[in-house]
Structures are given as structure tokens and as C-alpha cells.
């Protein structure tokens, strides 16, 4: 255990703002899968506060060491710098199409269907990509909390630690996804170094083709991620209209099924995009649950090596909205996610047609 802990500490530069794992130590990346309510045993499970935890050295999914509403868990600990009294040396963007404190004057439905946090200092920081409505609370709240509205259903949160320079690329991606930024701090050197982020907080977006963008991001420890972002004028499903062909693989997609205009599994192209219907964690205790109980958004290639975690569903309305996903070919990530697919909607026998050529 001690060598593993030392290795984790050495992988992330000292002084950099990073994701913190369930162990309380810096990690390069982690995934938290908040379980639906009523799945599992005990009062916490009944209230929908339990989660599964994954990072590169966790050996697969583990039970969360805290509850999702605790500041001692991976998510709460990572976000703690937001809620300290002195944040003058930080920059942050909190964005959510369902913000914690919506105003009648706001119309976030015109923005991208996208949720996340950018938090950084002068050495680096992290990108938290998630599916959670009304989250996280603004910095002015001075305390981490989990919204009651996000307890019932499953949710995913992917945190990746990045060097300072990588945030300029993220700024470009957000001009495509067109997020609703409900809380931010971007001053001095941060505004100078990241003009795209400044444009994002001002409500600007891309104004000419192409209406989609993919970029390579390299984490603090050197892990390679691929960010995919589309603007509303892209006018197609993220997964069947772009991602499957760009990655060159079939995809099994988990998304929120309680929306209008759900797109069926798509087998009309070279690469199949299959809707996941049921999720099951390994082991006799599971748990297992249906996609109608799960608000998370992720996809996995059935035979590897790709896994993506993002913020978009497969429905007709979101073909006309911005959003994206963050993908990687990390063995630990794929080996954890691929077995979760217990059942999916099969193809309907539609004839295949030649695929458009996409490059990553």
C-alpha cells in the first residue's frame, strides 16, 4: 500500500491543484458513480447517497469511503478549495444547464446541455465533467453540499487533473458546448492566458463552421484524453452522428431515458450505437438498475479500448444543443465500465450505409 501511495503522490506535481481521491491523496483522475436511491442496504442507500469509486490504482470499482454529500469523499474534497475564505489565487468556472439557483430571467435551455467545473491555480487544476443537476453550490455558499434533487437517480462525475497550459484547450471546447456559467472567477493572469474562457463567461460561442471540435488533452501524470464538443448547429446526435465514427468503434451508450424523443439504437451506419437499458455492478450485491433510474451519461466500446464520460443524452432535442464528452483509452477505465452493461437495445436490422469520414 505504501509504494502505491508514494507512486500516486509522485505522479502529480507538488503544489498543483488536483483531483483528490477517496484516500484523501492527490490522484490524476477518478470517476464517482453515484448510485440510484433504494439500491443497496442501509439508510444511506435508501436516501441515494452511496457511490462507487474508481481511479487508476483502485483495482476496479470500490464502495465510496464516505457519502456523496460529505466533504470527506473524493468529490467533496476536490471541490473544497472553492469554499475556502481565500480564493484570490484561484480561477474557476461552474457551469450547468440546470444551475443551483436558477433565475426567472435566465433561459439556460438555450445553452448547451452540459455540466462541469474548471478549477485551477497558477500551477494547474482539474476539469470535473458530470451529469448532476443543481450542482455544485456557488463559491459564495462557503460549503460543499449535494442537492436533494440529485439523490434519487444515478449520476457520474469524472475528475481529471491537468497542467496549467491545458486549460486554453478546454476554453476552446467550451465555446462549442456553450455552457450556462452560473459562477466564475477569472481575473488577472487567468483572463490574459485564457481568452477563450473569458469569452465563455461573457456568453460567447463559435459563430462559423465547423460546428464540432475534438482536441487531445494530457493530464498531469501524462494520461491522454480526447475531448469532443459540439455546438447546437451541428444538428445531429453526438454518438451516432460523430463519436462512433471518430473513434472507429461500436458504442454502448448509457443516458437518461426519461426524456422526450429518445433516439433508438442506430445501426444504419458502419458503427453501431446501442442504447444501454440496464446497468449491473460486479459481485453478488451489485447493485443493478435500469437506465430509467440512472441520469448518468457515458459510453463504452464493447471490445475496447474507448470509454467516454460526458453530459449528453440521445434524444431529438439534444441534437440541436451543445454538449460533449471526455474519452480515453485507459485500460483501468474500460475494464471498469464495459462489464457494467447488462442489457442494451439491439439493432433493428436497418441497412448500413457508408460512413462519413471523421478524424480524431
Curated annotation (Swiss-Prot):
Active site location: 295
UniProt entry tagged with the keyword Glycoprotein: yes
Consequence of changing residue 347 to A: Loss of activity
Variant or mutagenesis effect after changing residue 19 to A: Loss of activity
Modifications the protein undergoes after translation, according to the UniProt entry: Glycosylated. Genetic variations that affect N-glycosylation sites reduce activity, but enzymatic deglycosylation has no effect.
Effect on the protein of changing residue 121 to V: In AIPCS; reduced DNase activity
Effect of residue 151 to A: Loss of activity
Single Gene Ontology MF annotation: DNA binding
Cystine residue pairs: 19-159, 267-347, 308-327
Protein name: Deoxyribonuclease-2-alpha
Source organism: Homo sapiens
Amino acid at each position: 500500500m505504501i509504494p502505491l501511495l508514494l507512486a500516486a503522490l509522485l505522479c502529480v506535481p507538488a503544489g498543483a491543484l488536483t483531483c483528490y481521491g477517496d484516500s484523501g491523496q492527490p490522484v490524476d483522475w477518478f470517476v464517482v458513480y453515484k448510485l440510484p436511491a433504494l439500491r443497496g442496504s442501509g439508510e444511506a442507500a435508501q436516501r441515494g447517497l452511496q457511490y462507487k469509486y474508481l481511479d487508476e490504482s483502485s483495482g476496479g470499482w470500490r464502495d465510496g469511503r464516505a457519502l456523496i454529500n460529505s466533504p470527506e469523499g473524493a468529490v467533496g474534497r476536490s471541490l473544497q478549495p472553492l469554499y475556502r475564505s481565500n480564493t484570490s489565487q484561484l480561477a474557476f468556472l461552474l457551469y450547468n444547464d440546470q444551475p443551483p439557483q436558477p433565475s426567472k430571467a435566465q433561459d439556460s435551455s438555450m445553452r448547451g446541455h452540459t455540466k462541469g467545473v474548471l478549477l485551477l491555480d497558477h500551477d494547474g487544476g482539474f476539469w470535473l465533467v458530470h451529469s448532476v443537476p443543481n450542482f455544485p453550490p456557488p463559491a459564495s455558499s462557503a460549503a460543499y453540499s449535494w442537492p436533494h434533487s440529485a439523490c434519487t437517480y444515478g449520476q457520474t462525475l469524472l475528475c481529471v487533473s491537468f497542467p496549467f497550459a491545458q486549460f486554453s484547450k478546454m476554453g476552446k471546447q467550451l465555446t462549442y458546448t456553450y455552457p450556462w456559467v452560473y459562477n466564475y472567477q477569472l481575473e488577472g493572469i487567468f483572463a490574459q492566458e485564457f481568452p477563450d474562457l473569458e469569452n465563455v463567461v461573457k456568453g460567447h460561442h463559435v459563430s462559423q463552421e465547423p460546428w464540432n471540435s475534438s482536441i487531445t488533452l494530457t493530464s498531469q501524470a501524462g494520461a491522454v484524453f480526447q475531448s469532443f464538443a459540439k455546438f447546437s448547429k451541428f444538428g445531429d446526435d453526438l454518438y451516432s452522428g460523430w463519436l462512433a465514427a471518430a473513434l472507429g468503434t461500436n458504442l454502448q451508450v448509457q443516458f437518461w431515458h426519461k426524456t422526450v424523443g429518445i433516439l433508438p439504437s442506430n445501426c444504419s451506419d458502419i458503427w453501431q450505437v446501442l442504447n444501454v437499458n440496464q446497468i449491473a455492478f460486479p459481485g453478488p450485491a451489485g447493485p443493478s438498475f435500469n437506465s430509467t433510474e440512472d441520469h448518468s451519461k457515458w459510453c463504452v466500446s464493447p471490445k475496447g479500448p474507448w470509454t467516454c464520460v460526458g453530459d449528453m443524452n440521445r434524444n431529438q432535442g439534444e441534437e440541436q444543443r451543445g454538449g460533449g464528452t471526455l474519452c480515453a483509452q485507459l485500460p483501468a477505465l474500460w475494464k471498469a465500465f464495459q462489464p457494467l452493461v447488462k442489457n442494451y437495445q439491439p439493432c433493428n436490422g436497418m441497412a448500413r450505409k457508408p460512413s462519413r469520414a471523421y478524424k480524431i
